[in-house]
Amino acid sequence: MAEQLSLFGSPEPERAPVKPVPAAASAQPKPAPEPVTAYASVVLDIPTRALSEPFAYGIPRSFANEAQIGSTVLVHFGNRAAAGYIVDIAFELGDLQGNSALDPARIKPIEAILSKPLFTAEAARITRWMSREYVATLSECLRLFLPPGGSPRVVKSDDGMWTVERPAVKPIQNRWVMLTPEGFDYTPPKTAVRQRQLIEALQCGPVTTRDLNLLYNSMSATIKALEKRGVVVVEERRAWRGCSEQTTLSSASGKAPVALTNGQQQALAQIERARLDAHGDVVLVDGVTGSGKTEVYLSAIERVLAAGRSACVLVPEISLTAQTVGRFRSRFGETVAVFHSRLSAGERLDQWDMVASGAARVVVGARSALFCPLSDLGLIIIDEEHETSYKQGSSPRYHAREVAAEMARRYRCPLVLGSATPSAEALDRCHRGTYGGVTWTRVEMPERPGHAVLPTVRIADLRREFSHGSRSMFSKPLMEGLERVVERREKAVLLHNRRGFAPFLMCRECGCVPTCNHCSTALTYHERTHTLQCHTCGSSWRVQPYPAPTSRCPKCGSRYLAKMGLGTQQIEDALHQMLPEDVAIIRMDADSTRGKDAHKKLLEQFDAADCAVLLGTQMIAKGLDFPEVTLVGVVNADFALKLPDFRAGERAYDLLEQVAGRAGRGDRPGEVIIQTYLPEDPVIRAVAEHDRSIFTDYDLDQRRDALYPPFVRLVNILAWSANRDDAQDYIGRIAKLLKRRWHAAAPDFLRAGSAVPQVLGPASCVIERAKDRYRFHLLVKSPVGYHVSDDIDACLKEVGSVRGVSVSVDVDAYDLM
């Protein structure tokens, strides 16, 4: 028998079972079909581009009250059964979008209702928009709005029958023990020690049976005895997993300040105007690091909650979640839900259900939190909006900023973007004044609250250090800065955006660099595990560097394999040798934060230390607020500057400016030391002088001349296959179709005063081979405002699918590697 799903994950009350559906049609005569009272558009839960559109099904009279938009249903599709989701309902078949020409007599009925509505009609409309905007299937987009734990699956059993499998993740119930009114007056016998312990434990309120058993080593018999006497009562209540994300971080306090700065007041006033106008306008809060943007968010949310609406807050890094959630919960209590990938499946389900039930009115989390079922959404906030982590890496490859803007327009609520280094796209739209039918407004917050000032930035020219005989990874200014931190018992942050011990090994005899057997990627050496690891596919090989006789060059057999470059592990070792033992050295990168709550524990360790150095990759550069940090050091600022990516400079500037902002956030002044071989680079100069225009003026001129965003929209179409020729041929066919299409339409573009979309390539990717697949891509540059996705979708359908070849479309692409 197949179980049905309820909105909150638990089985519905028992009703007529869903009969297994035969895999093939039966030869026996069929009973007369039940009358159909309406029609539904059903998106099949089969993620293939060939089935990207919804299919029409009839709603039998027996399901008329249960079939709603958002319901999961069981349907026949061809010679199989499938689960699907209702996205539209109409009484006439012709009123369903795209189904006006269908014959009602040929429409199959829905076989069963598998769940109550899991998403709203507005969510279904946003799904359609996402599917068209990002050239993704409807089922892929719909899954974003579904409760965690998986959707129902229809599987074929050994006997040839199709059956429904429900998700394994289920809610749990806690048993709570509490005193009855009579229980407060009950006096246990003198010899009933356990009863006295239980009653004393319950005097301050209900306690779970689990906690009582842990405290007093099994209280089950005592609870039963007092329950029979009417002294206590036991109730089952839904447990909300994921609510215990407590933190000892001092920066997690959400106490409101005595007064807001002028910049904070202006930002809050602009957000309030956008809220009252109710057009879905966008407000960009452009505030220097430490200017108090979070307090603006908290104050804006207070007004939204007072109006009876809800709010969604996105943060870019899991490492920021504990700090942010702590501040929000200290202000708004347990009405705050948290949603990110490090939660267990059960915790995500419970947090989702807290939102769906209305128990939580504020959601804080990563980009996926945007799709939580908040009722009457009144405000969306995206903190550090410039961060690339808001771009989804797999289909549907949406950008949270763009989806949030569409949601804000539909829900008629403001979208607030906050950053000390706003993206070029956000700044350009604010300069235009309008985009996507709504107003974009920029509000500056140029000062820090209180007596805090921006840190002093010093450039350590590594060329000069080398010419003076220094071979250390630390320049003289940085070493002196660390010594001052130790003397004053303060704290420092060191950024190095390369994890591992050394970025690669190199043969000293032939120059060979070992690469991954499955990817065209150099392997990174990890000292702790003595492994070479591929950071593209995750493969690893045990290895011992010279003079170990077991490790040899794969090309010439030499034993002279040298560790080249620096990784965070190697810098950590050097710090331990250089600094006193009583200085805590805490490394924070992808390797040290694999475990659950690892980010929070490391930050709490840093916060609690008397004197400490926090060493890490880019995850330490964003949003962290530690007033005791007086020194920020950048070990090598040049890694990201010369990558083959037009956004390389912007990313480098964002990273350096953000990490510089970790210094001097309290009463003590801050200092930033940036080590570089390129002190004349506009990125380095802009950070050193706290003048963004030095970089942005140069960068925007380069992009305007080369036609890159924000002056065009950029689409990356990627094909990959185990067969190199197949992938290259497939992407070549798409390129020909697009060029032919736009060449024919060129007069229409010119008459409209618009540029013609361009096709660059195809060419092999920078990382040509990954996970044993050869990768080729082409780039499309489209005028802003032209819906290029429709043309790309049409060409993909014309080419069709090719066995063994996969294709992806990345609209507004960020990853071009």
Model features per residue range: what roles?
Residues 745, 751-756, 770-774, 786, ...:
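Nucleotide-binding motor/catalytic cores of P-loop/tubulin-like NTPases across gene-expression machines
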